[in-house]
């Protein structure tokens, strides 16, 4: 039987700091290439990659898990020893449970947050498009989405949760008090920026500006917010005009450097700028935090705020874990039954060959005009002898130390009671 198994590995906000996570993230436009590289250069049959600001995880089907895990460092041109301390490896049942917990929001920085479910679905679509999603992973994610829906509909896991977007707004209010007098700049136009923009817009800031590489998408968001649009090229001149900056783009390199912020602060005559960088890899150079008049927060810095209200939801967590555990058992039953299918198929094929052989022999005897009753008797004897030959041979030739186990096994298979 093949030793190919379900396997998951990766890093997340619990095991690795931001400066490590950003080194192994996968931009959306590089996902297909990465998936092809993994299945082409490693003993991996199926693969899906989940890459968010808080995690990079690979779900795969492989018979050599160690080679699969080494790929992550190799692909990003990192020494394996540098990534090793932060990696988790989850074989079979642990991989299933982890997938269910992630989709249900139990493994998120924001407990119960719904965005991860959409991110998982995006990962599945990418794997489907790349042709790396086989039956095993398809079944896993199909069940994963079912479990996540059950958890969210049967528990209050998402109640009173503080999203990253809400946390950004709360932090801004702590620094400025009334956001209604502040000018807010959003860099990017993806889902996270849209969520943040909705929270800030509800506070009616003095002005909202959206900067994005694709102007059309920025215009659509700005229109909903009654804001204005600028291009990324205009950032050096426009930055000083804003009090609050929230950024989350898919750029692989920082777009806001220390020098640009120094010039902006000088132009603002040292009035403070509040910045939230929700991107991974980061949009803002970490050195910007060294500036006295810049309050820079990353996704990891928001952790304490998003944990507010966690104690009140421990009951919901216990309910969710129970739902997940039950579904893990069911999925493992399916997985284990799937692994014996080839053996069952081979057994049936062998029986079919016996049947056809005896049937053809009987037909030839009938064609010769021999007694049908004798032919039927001969056919039944032939089938009986063929079916019993191999187990009988195994019993007669078994080694002494394995004979008792073999007797027990055959007795159970054929419901025998030899001692009676």
UniProtKB/Swiss-Prot annotation:
**Can you say what this protein is called?**
Glutamyl-tRNA reductase
Q: In which pathway does it act?
A: Porphyrin-containing compound metabolism; protoporphyrin-IX biosynthesis; 5-aminolevulinate from L-glutamyl-tRNA(Glu): step 1/2
Which residues does the record give as NADP(+) binding sites?
188-193
Q: Which SUPFAM superfamilies does its entry note? A: Glutamyl tRNA-reductase catalytic, N-terminal domain, Glutamyl tRNA-reductase dimerization domain, NAD(P)-binding Rossmann-fold domains
Tell me the keywords, alphabetical order.
NADP, Oxidoreductase, Porphyrin biosynthesis
Active-site residue numbers: 53
Family matches, as Gene3D superfamilies: Glutamyl-tRNA reductase, N-terminal domain, NAD(P)-binding Rossmann-like Domain
